[in-house]
Amino acid sequence: MIRRQLINFQNRSVDVRVGLGAFEELSRMFASAVGKPKRAMVVWGDATSERFGEVVEHALVDAGFAVSQLILDVSPAGATLADADVVFGALSANGITCDDLVVAVGDAATCSVVCWCANQWCGRTECA
């Protein structure tokens, strides 16, 4: 059984799904995050499981995205401006625009800096 909860933060909301089979919905969730799937950039924490990475990448491809990847080594103590600079460089190099999707996979420090960068990029790019 999959449980779904919508969490609202001021003018933004987060759709959280938990339960057995939640990964089977990744493709549909990714496709609905943007108008028309085109490009997606996945930013991995360096400790992310290889198997989980395959599941996320296949879900993006199944949803119709061309996928680019970045492995980011962020300190568990927190991200730095240098980490953000690496993410911004990859967004630029991969041609990511506000019509595309950024996916953050990893610990809190990694996901935090990636989501912050996506929010700043091109006036706000969706981040999952």
Q: Where would I find each of the regions flagged by the language model?
A:
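ATP/NTP phosphate-donor binding region
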Residues: M1-D100
